[in-house]
From Swiss-Prot:
It is found in: Cytoplasm; Nucleus. This is Probable quinone oxidoreductase. Its EC number is 1.6.5.5. Pfam families: ADH_N, ADH_zinc_N. The modification Phosphoserine is found at residue 191. It comes from Schizosaccharomyces pombe (strain 972 / ATCC 24843). The keyword Ribosomal protein does not apply.
Amino acid sequence: MSNLLVQVSKTGPSSVLQVITKEIPKPAPNGLVIKNAYAGLNYIDTYLRTGLYTAPLPYIPGKEAAGVVAAVGDKVEADFKVGDRVVYLTPFGAYAQYTNVPTTLVSKVSEKIPLKIASAALLQGLTAYTLIEEAYPVKTGDTVVVHAAAGGVGLLLCQMLRARNVHVIATASTAAKRRIAIKNGAEIACSYEDLTKVVADYTNGKGVDAAYDSVGIDTLSSSLDALRNGGTMVSFGNASGAIDAIPLKFLSARCLKFVRPSLFGYITGHAVFEGYVSRLWKEILDNNLNIAIHHIFKLSEAKEAHDAIESRATTGKLLLLCNEDLADA
């Protein structure tokens, strides 16, 4: 049997994504081979592909997937067996039919949760948790800005923040996206260009407690301008381009804080990972979180999937279907 996968041998546009075939990997002694049902797409996949972030070449993209255990290493002590339904996080390797991963960031999935939902929820759900509990821990009554609020993380942030009685001012590029943000928990939604005025009106000139910004350079100024004295900007993406540096004078005058978090910096081991994942599954099963999937591409359509996410025209999550026989698992 062969293993269809996507490989990047040089950095560049989406055309550098090569679909190739290799042998199915054998499990490492302390690892699992996962037969992937779905791999999740994330903006960081494009940052690595373009060279904005460094990756060892050649590499297989993809940081998350859901599937079933196909093989278990002979030294694995954790409770995994062939056939288990699982999700996992990995530095690289999810854009493949089969992936060899250590057990550290692998978690079982309830039979009640379809694997496509589990894959769509995992990385972005955990990202949203860490943004509002670690990067800037929100409090009841806070007012925050969520940029790109109709994207995968943005929609989850709106829902989680509403559940915590936090007031959300959302930004999105179109009226349709702004309506989606309102439906998912934002109190008010506006264009990127109107944010400064909307924040001033909504907060009576005080400013917001925090701004969660995945857009990058295009919204840097408006995010900082929106903050109250002592407010916090949480920068967690570069969809419009990277922020190279921030002069300290932009922060010092109003005692602003700037945070650049990383999910993998917070997920420090299996216990932490399992704690977040178990909460995520409970919220999904309790119908407290709506997981929006924008489109599912075939694994061989990775280029088209990257083009779609980079267009910034999507809402919710993009997935790659890795094994068609697991499409309904």
